[in-house]
Amino acid sequence: MVSSNGSQCPYDDSFKYTLYGCMFSMVFVLGLISNCVAIYIFICALKVRNETTTYMINLAMSDLLFVFTLPFRIFYFATRNWPFGDLLCKISVMLFYTNMYGSILFLTCISVDRFLAIVYPFKSKTLRTKRNAKIVCIAVWFTVMGGSAPAVFFQSTHSQGNNTSEACFENFPAATWKTYLSRIVIFIEIVGFFIPLILNVTCSSMVLRTLNKPVTLSRSKMNKTKVLKMIFVHLVIFCFCFVPYNINLILYSLMRTQTFVNCSVVAAVRTMYPITLCIAVSNCCFDPIVYYFTSDTIQNSIKMKNWSVRRSDSRFSEVQGTENFIQHNLQTLKNKIFDNESAI
């Protein structure tokens, strides 16, 4: 499908339908399984929950809500027709932005919580409570839903292909970008990306500096290694999933408002947009890795389950070995009796 950005740069972006269909199918399977397992562990397996667990539960719920909309998107990208109505189109768009920026903010909450626990372990006791964590989570949900509301307002289904099919998730008109969306993108990028990015990098740097102080050298190397792994995994997932898309979104907004009209740059930005969006969506699959490295209780639960499985397997092997030993002795005894009878 050849489209235009409102300037003299026609561009064929039809490759995005195949890319979205394949990537969203994979994210649906992996994201559904991993986040369902995570929520089961959080709710059913963990006996003790703290404020970090509260953030992770909300992050998993945000991922699942978006994952549940993926089958509708997959159908649309496969058939290029949206038969599910305007309301479901708006809900799907809202949950996309809610998930992306909700994930960014909840990951930032986890990073700040870790910073307070390690850098100010005693002073932060009154702040790091489950009640305060719940209040923060409610504030995050209101923020991301409020931020995604304008996109929902402007997004709607429309006829395409001589009125033979309905379209959803397609781009907004150039006039809408110039009047409203460019300002909304600026707000979203500042509140939902740049401030959280600065907080994540700053908190991680402060934690690393605290761990390297002579006062903390007495701490076990194992605990320091755990924290270092935690910070590394957290930052890698955050930067890998969200930095490319949000940087490209800024360039895309500039392109749609015709701030620059160089056709080579326009083609590069439009090509990278669906690719970076797919990378951002993959955060649903990577968030459970954050849960594992962040929570000792989750690691212990998984290790306990593996230990119980191995223990049951070893018990089964012992029982089976004992039965084989008894059967072997009985067979030997029978053979001896038979030999004695034959000798008589």
Curated annotation (Swiss-Prot):
Species whose genome carries this gene: Mus musculus (Mouse)
Record-annotated membrane-spanning stretches: 26-46, 57-77, 91-111, 135-155, 184-204, 231-251, 273-293
Where is it localised?
Answer: Cell membrane
Sequence similarity: Belongs to the G-protein coupled receptor 1 family.
Entry-listed glycosylation sites: 5, 162-163, 262
Q: Can the keyword Cell membrane be found in this entry's annotation?
A: yes
- The protein's role, per its UniProt record: Binds to oleoyl-L-alpha-lysophosphatidic acid (LPA). Intracellular cAMP is involved in the receptor activation. Important for the maintenance of hair growth and texture.
Question: What is the protein name given in its UniProt record?
Answer: Lysophosphatidic acid receptor 6
Which GO MF terms are attached to this record?
G protein-coupled receptor activity
For the Extracellular compartment, the record's topological domain ranges are 1-25, 78-90, 156-183, 252-272
